Amino acid sequence: MKEKIIKTKVGQLFVSYQPAEKIAVFLSGAGSLPTYENFLPVIRKLPKNWGYLTIDYPNTGQSPLENQENFVLDDLVQSILEVLSQFKVIQYAVCAHSISGLVSVKVAESEQFCQGLILIELTTYSVLYGELAQNPYPEFLALQEKVQTLGGGYEYLKKIGQESFSVADFKILWAKAERSSDRLKSVQEGFQHYCSIAKSDFQNLDISFQFPIFILSQAYREQEYKDSEFASQNTQIILGGSHHYLHWSQSEKIVELLLEMG
């Protein structure tokens, strides 16, 4: 495995790369989790002819701090394309969590080498700007109460991750996430953690791809995805799991889907 920091439009990005005939590109959602460790339950199950490329966004994981105040989503997409180009990745599928589902669709729109998308509990327009932003799912509100009852995010993630991670792997994941988030306590006022994501970024998406799109979702979100901007003839919704981090609990299924693509 190669680890490298690559200079891009939005700042320096920390990446982990294992070359192979085919590449699984992993993108984490919002938060401070380092991408390699976040997707380790999937990465450990990849067959030998599949390599991987994991990318930490600015201010996340092991990527350096960089104010994102002046950057928009297209800038982040361009930066991901720069990383793919540097490693000459030409046969790949993207496995993306949460808001990175939108990022991965934009990446696939921009060039021709993507062979499939696995979108895990991806963020829709409705959740960020629409009906579900105004009236969240009861399940989501119940989750917030559960996290508080357990004593915070660490205890909750530890509980749901214990079946997917060894104790040692989870400690590494959380230690790196804490180091990443602790850095943000000392940034100056006005520092923006993420690039700006506008309503227009969800509109006029071109998802008429010739490759499969798999959406992994908890059952209660099925209709949201059927009605979303990500629905198409090539989109298949796969229900399962009982929490947002389905790449932990459904890692075997994700590997099966990758193998279907290649």
Predicted regions and their residues:
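Conserved serine/cysteine hydrolase catalytic core
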Residues: K176-G241
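Conserved HGGG/HGGXW glycine-rich cap/lid loop of the alpha/beta-hydrolase fold
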Residues: L13-Q62
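Catalytic histidine-centered segment of alpha/beta-hydrolase-like enzymes
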Residues: S242-S251
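N-terminal cap/lid segment of alpha/beta-hydrolase-fold proteins
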Residues: M1-Q12
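Short beta-strand immediately N-terminal to the catalytic nucleophile in serine-hydrolase-like folds
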Residues: V94-A96, I120
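Gly/Ala-rich beta-loop-alpha elbow adjacent to hydrolase catalytic centers
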Residues: A96-S100, S104
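Active-site loop/oxyanion-hole signature of alpha/beta-hydrolase fold enzymes
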Residues: R44, T54-A93
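Flexible "cap/lid" loop of the alpha/beta hydrolase fold
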Residues: L117-L150
